[in-house]
Structures are given as structure tokens and as C-alpha cells.
């Protein structure tokens, strides 16, 4: 029974693939050498035994096919079973990224609250400046009169500042800062866990790829063993002079094994492709936790600087309110009012500086955090 042209062509391709694999894999090359030697020895043995009539086709089948080929096929099957999982989907990483974006959004919300408080502080700053300007006008007046108080208009402006109060005094920012710190600590722990998990996933996938590569070698071993079995069987038939029906049965054995070998290789190649795709995906997402860490560092730095400056601004406004109270309380004493207003004139300069510092810091770290968010998004989408 001859092979069809199509089968012959495919068989030749597989033989070429087997030979190429032997050239690339030392272990497979060593196996092939042993197979070649074993084939040679078996041919010699069968030739001698044929002359004495002590060999049978059944023994050839048992020696070459049943025992050796089944054992090798079992090893291949074990590896295929080990590697037959679906492509990895990292729900943990997706959750981590979502938490990171939520965290940075909360930070930006806090900065927005700070900005709103600063706007209120600027309004208070204008009241103080107006009071200082009015104080200078009032100081220039002469002969105020008994019914008119010299610094009446000045005190009216100060009352506006007092009515406004301290925009940083409601405790909202303090609560937000404390919650933000806890959230960042929790997120940092999750980032660390995810980095370790991804590293472990990569290590496991690499091991499985190594196993599949080994299985690929084994599949070539199977093919080599099949070819060996076919050659040995045909030689045995010729040596024993068994009739045509049995010879024909042996001839049809190789195409079946070749087809089985093709099936094994098809599964192995699919498994290897899936694992390589999984490894590629893991390596792609591996930098993401590190990028999130970078973003958190920017977050942390901002959350460290802003509260400090906010506290300083809050203290400055509290000090101004106390001085305003003193000035209002000294309503009947022009000398005391004058001293308090001169102090406020110096303090409002410090207030202006503090407001500017907070505004610049919030703007700077808001920009940094937004850029960090963008970099993470670019890494996730593969555009960065």
C-alpha cells in the first residue's frame, strides 16, 4: 500500500521538521542518535533471529510499538493536560487600576476643596486690605466730631472679615486628609501584593512554556519512535517471510501514527501559542503596578506639602481674626485701634504670601497627579 501524493508530501514535511528539531535540541538529537543505534541493533538482531526462526511479528509489535510508544505518548499527554488552561485574565490588576484612579480622583477632590477654601481666604484678604486702606483714610481725617467715630468705616470692613470666619476651620479638610492617608496605605499594600502576584504568574507561565517545549521535543521523539517502529516492523516481516496481509497491516501503521503525531503537535502548538500570548500579556502589564507606585509617590508628596501649607494659612487667618477682634474691641480707643491696624497691615502681606504658596502648590501637584494618571492610562492602553 503506497502513500498518496498528499500524504507523502505531509510525511516528508514532518520528517524535515523532526530533523530540524533534532538540530536545535541537544536532548532530542541525543534521543535520535539512540533511536538510530537501536534501529541498527534491532535490524541486526532481527536478521539473526530470522535465520533461526525465533522472531515473530507480534514480538516486533510489542517491543517497538506497544511498550515504547505508549510510554512516550503518556508523557506527552501528561504535559498537554498540564498546559491545557485558558488564557489568563487578570481581574486583580483591573481592580487595582480602578482603585488607583479612584484614589487620585479623591486627591484631586481634596485639592479642589483646598482651592475653594483659598478663594474664601482671598475674599478675606480683600476685606483686610480694604480695612487697611480705609484706616489710612480715616487717619487723615481731622475734626471728626463727637458723634462720628474716626475709625468707624475701618471697623465696618473688619466686621466683614470677622463674619466670614476661617474657611479652613470646619474640619472637612482634616477628615479628608486622614481618610486619604488610610486609602493610600491600603492601595500601597495592594500594589505590593499585585506586583508579587504578577511576578509569580510570569514565573509559572515560563515554567509551563518550558514544559510545553519539552513536550514538543517529546512529540518529535514519538514521531522518531514511530518511524523506528515502522522500519523495524517492515524489516521483521521481510526477515520472517510473513505473508502479504500482515505486511500490508504494518505498512498502514505509519500513516495512522503520523496523523496522531500531527494531532499531538497541533495541540502542543496551540498550548504554546496560548502560553506565549499569556506571557506577553503578563509582561505587558508587569510595569503597571510600578507606574501606579510612581503615581502614588506624586500623590504622597502632594498630600504631604499641601496640608502643611494649609495649616500655616489657617493659623495665619486665625491670627488675623484675633487681631481684628482686638481692633473691634478697641473701638473707643483710637490708639489701640491704630496699633491693631498697623499690625494687620503687616499680617496681610504674610497672608498674601501664604495664599500664593498654597495656590501654586495645589496647582503643581494637581498637574503632577493628572500626568501620572495619564501615564498609567497610556501604559494600560499600550500607547505609552
Swiss-Prot record:
InterPro entries referenced in this protein's UniProt entry, alphabetically: DUF677
Residue spans crossing the bilayer: 217-237, 242-262
Pfam families: DUF677
Regions annotated as coiled coil: 184-215, 264-361
GO CC, alphabetical: membrane
Compartments reported by the entry: Membrane
Keywords for the protein's UniProt record, in alphabetical order: Coiled coil, Membrane, Transmembrane, Transmembrane helix
Major subcellular location class: membrane
Membrane topology: Multi-pass membrane protein
PANTHER family: (RAPE) HYPOTHETICAL PROTEIN (PTHR31113:SF13), UPF0496 PROTEIN 3-RELATED (PTHR31113)
Sequence similarity: Belongs to the UPF0496 family.
Name of the protein in question: UPF0496 protein At3g28310/At3g28320
Annotated source species: Arabidopsis thaliana
Lineage of source species: Eukaryota, Viridiplantae, Streptophyta, Embryophyta, Tracheophyta
Amino acid at each position: 500500500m503506497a502513500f498518496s501524493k498528499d500524504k507523502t508530501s505531509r510525511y516528508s514535511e514532518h520528517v524535515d521538521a523532526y530533523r530540524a528539531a533534532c538540530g536545535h535540541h541537544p536532548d532530542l538529537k541525543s534521543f535520535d542518535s539512540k533511536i538510530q543505534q537501536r534501529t541498527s541493533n534491532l535490524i541486526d538482531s532481527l536478521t539473526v533471529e530470522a535465520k533461526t526462526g525465533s522472531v515473530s511479528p507480534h514480538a516486533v509489535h510489542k517491543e517497538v510499538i506497544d511498550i515504547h510508544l505508549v510510554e512516550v505518548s503518556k508523557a506527552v499527554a501528561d504535559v498537554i493536560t498540564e498546559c491545557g488552561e485558558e488564557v489568563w485574565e487578570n481581574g486583580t490588576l483591573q481592580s487595582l487600576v480602578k482603585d488607583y484612579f479612584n484614589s487620585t480622583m479623591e486627591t484631586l477632590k481634596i485639592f479642589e476643596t483646598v482651592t475653594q477654601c483659598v478663594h474664601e481666604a482671598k475674599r478675606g484678604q480683600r476685606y483686610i486690605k480694604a480695612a487697611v486702606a480705609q484706616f489710612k483714610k480715616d487717619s487723615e481725617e481731622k475734626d471728626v466730631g463727637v458723634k462720628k467715630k474716626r475709625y468707624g468705616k475701618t471697623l465696618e470692613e473688619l466686621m466683614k472679615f470677622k463674619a466670614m470666619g476661617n474657611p479652613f476651620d470646619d474640619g472637612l479638610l482634616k477628615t479628608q486628609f486622614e481618610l486619604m492617608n488610610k486609602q493610600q496605605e491600603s492601595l500601597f499594600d495592594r500594589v505590593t501584593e499585585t506586583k508579587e502576584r504578577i511576578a509569580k504568574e510570569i514565573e509559572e507561565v515560563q515554567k509551563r512554556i518550558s514544559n510545553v517545549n519539552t513536550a514538543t521535543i517529546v512529540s518529535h521523539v514519538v514521531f522518531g519512535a514511530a518511524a523506528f517502529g515502522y522500519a523495524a516492523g517492515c524489516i521483521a516481516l521481510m526477515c520472517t517471510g510473513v505473508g502479504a496481509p500482515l505486511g500490508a497491516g504494518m505498512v498502514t501503521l505509519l500513516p495512522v501514527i503520523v496523523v496522531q503525531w500531527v494531532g499531538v503537535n497541533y495541540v502542543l502548538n496551540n498550548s504554546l501559542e496560548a502560553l506565549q500570548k499569556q506571557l506577553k500579556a503578563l509582561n505587558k502589564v508587569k510595569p503597571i503596578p510600578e507606574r501606579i507606585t510612581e503615581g502614588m509617590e506624586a500623590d504622597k508628596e502632594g498630600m504631604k506639602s499641601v496640608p502643611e501649607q494649609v495649616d500655616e494659612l489657617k493659623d495665619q487667618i486665625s491670627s488675623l481674626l484675633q487681631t481684628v477682634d482686638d481692633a473691634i474691641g478697641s473701638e473707643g480707643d483710637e490708639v489701640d485701634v491704630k496699633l491693631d491696624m498697623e499690625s494687620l497691615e503687616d499680617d496681610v502681606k504674610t497672608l498674601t504670601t501664604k495664599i500664593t504658596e498654597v495656590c501654586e502648590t495645589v496647582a503643581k501637584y494637581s498637574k503632577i497627579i493628572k500626568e501620572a494618571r495619564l501615564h498609567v492610562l497610556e501604559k494600560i492602553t499600550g500607547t505609552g
